[in-house]
Regions:
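C-terminal module of multi-pass small-molecule transporters
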Residues: 11, 59-64, 68-81, 89, ...
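Helix-loop-helix hairpins in multi-pass membrane proteins, especially solute transporters
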Residues: 60-200
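Transmembrane-helix exit segments and adjacent C-terminal regions of multi-pass membrane proteins
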Residues: 1-13, 443-515
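A membrane-interface helix-boundary motif in multi-pass transporters
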Residues: 157-168, 217-229, 297, 418-473
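Structural signature of transmembrane alpha-helices in multi-pass secondary transporters
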Residues: 20, 49-52, 56, 83, ...
């Protein structure tokens, strides 16, 4: 296929990804207002984000496996419909519980879009050329991430719209994406025997859910070291062990265990978990920091994150083209991990009064690091598996990245809540005010607080936000160690077979194998 033909075929897919990213990020700057209006607290704030990531995590391998069995075009259209349905329902939510449930529906659709975008690109484009188009995908993600917070801020700040329109704004784009997908995406349908590992999917979902519930509630509803923690951790471990046993024995497992005999996949998974923890877990609270600690409006909060998104846009597009030209990718993963770690560590120094230009530089480093790492980890994995396992292998990386993100949001959200409580107690005690007063369970509206108390609240959230970025820095370092240990295999120019590299491939594939 020519470059133009590929772009035409990918246009609807890229538009669908844009809808998913836009509909997710448009909420980020509106969340403080949404949670305040729905009378929620820090735990609800965390779960509105975590619920979507959890559903995305749990369903990504299912969508990936289905793509190896059914029409990829039909599946991506179905995932888009599910995502839009969740968005419309979320716009009708009257309580934080209803909103969280609707966000789960959104996450199911997002899991399909996340997994299928990578799988469809891998089906159409040889690995050597894929870096170029992965850059386009990264650019679309960057534009959606840039536009989302800005649009969300404008919607929230416009009195005759209100935050509910944050969930409706993506619907017209979704309808257009469905039409374009129907007209432009042409993929061969490969008929295979249908074997879905529902037991494995159920056990994996249950294990991850229990783990996230424990992380979210520990330190708030009960102590980290308590009988409740022991029961939940033991339960998650037991469910995880059962899932591993089921996957090992399943005829067609959801996450094929033999993939992890591939060194590249194993190390890419470790790096993806680390990137997910840092990227989702730390950056999701930026809007809260800018609005509560610095008193910014939702619109201004979106504008203030532009350096991070700009770094992501530049690195994903430029590096993708360079990788296509050279066929070499490892050095960019290493550089990206270094920048990511440095960005997190530097953001750990931020406080309520940190000069903005310092934060802009630090956020740009994080954006550059994510842009160099996220898509190229998937690319490295796809280069080492046979064509009929592209869906499973791609979804494995996306699964663990989303898992890392969900764990990161839950864990770092718990850290944020704990640190805010401690810092506010210290600050209020210096004013002679009991900490149980203004430090209640809801998110504060700093504009309604008396001057001295507002200063305490702003300082508490600023210091706590710095703490969670500092806590994310070791995960960037873990990603660096993992990518350094990956053995680079030059990108092949054909989808016919993986590069023969001994044990580097999951299984030997005869030449000429076709999807």
């Amino acid at each position: 296929m020519s470059h133009r033909q590929i772009l035409e075929a990918l246009s609807g897919l890229l538009l669908g990804m844009f809808v998913a990213i836009l509909s997710s990020t448009v909420v980020s700057n509106a969340l403080p207002r949404i949670i305040t209006d729905l009378r929620g607290g820090q735990s609800a704030y965390t779960w509105v984000v975590t619920s979507t990531l959890l559903a995305t995590t749990a369903t990504t391998p299912i969508w990936g496996k289905l793509s190896d069995l059914f029409s990829k075009k039909l599946l991506v259209q179905l995932s888009l419909v599910v995502f839009v349905l969740g968005s419309v329902l979320a716009g009708q939510a009257q309580t934080t519980g209803e909103l969280i449930a609707c966000r789960v529906v959104q996450g199911v659709g997002a899991g399909g879009l996340t997994a299928l975008a990578q799988v469809i690109m891998a089906t159409m484009i040889a690995p050597r050329e894929r870096g170029r188009y992965s850059g386009y995908l990264g650019a679309v993600m960057a534009v959606g991430t840039i536009g989302g917070p800005l649009i969300g801020g404008v919607i929230v700040d416009t009195s005759w719209l209100g935050w509910r329109w944050c969930f409706y704004v993506g619907v017209p784009f979704a309808v257009l994406a469905l039409i374009v997908l129907q007209r432009t995406l042409r993929l061969p349908v490969v008929k295979r025997e249908v074997k879905i590992d529902w037991w494995g999917a159920t056990l994996i979902t249950a294990a991850v859910s229990l783990l996230l519930v424990w992380i979210t509630l520990a330190g708030d509803r009960y102590d980290w070291i308590s009988w409740q923690s022991g029961v939940m951790v033991a339960g998650a471990a037991l469910l995880g062990a059962l899932a591993a046993r089921v996957e090992k024995r399943a005829a067609d497992p959801m996450i094929p265990p033999h993939l992890f005999r591939n060194r590249t996949i194993t190390l890419a998974v470790i790096a993806s978990i680390a990137v997910g923890v840092g990227m989702f877990g730390a950056s999701v609270f930026l809007g809260q920091y800018f609005q509560i600690s610095r008193g910014a409006s939702p619109t201004m909060s979106g504008l203030m994150t532009l350096p991070m998104i700009g770094g992501l846009l530049v690195s994903s597009t430029v590096v993708g083209r360079i990788i296509t030209s050279t066929g070499r990718w490892k050095s960019w993963l290493v550089i990206g991990s270094v920048l990511l770690t440095a960005g997190f560590a530097l953001m750990g120094t931020m406080r309520a009064d940190t000069p903005y230009w310092h934060l802009a530089v630090f956020m740009a480093l994080i954006g550059l690091g994510v842009g160099m790492s996220m898509q190229n980890l998937v690319l490295a994995v796809q280069n080492t598996v046979r064509p009929d396992e592209l869906g499973a292998a791609s979804s494995v990386v996306a699964f663990f990245r989303s898992l890392g993100g969900a764990i990161g949001v839950s864990a770092l959200g718990a850290v944020l809540g704990h640190r805010v409580t401690g810092y506010m107690a210290d600050g209020l005690s210096r004013l002679g005010i009991p900490a149980s007063g203004p430090g209640g369970g809801g998110l504060p509206d700093v504009h309604t607080l008396p001057g001295p108390i507002r200063t305490v609240v702003e300082a508490a959230y600023g210091h706590a936000a710095g703490d969670i970025f500092l806590a994310a820095a070791p995960f960037g370092l873990l990603a660096l160690v993992a990518v350094v240990l990956i053995r680079e295999v030059p990108l092949r120019r054909s989808n016919a077979e993986p590069v023969p590299a001994g044990r580097e491939t999951a299984e030997a594939v005869p030449a000429g194998t076709k999807d």
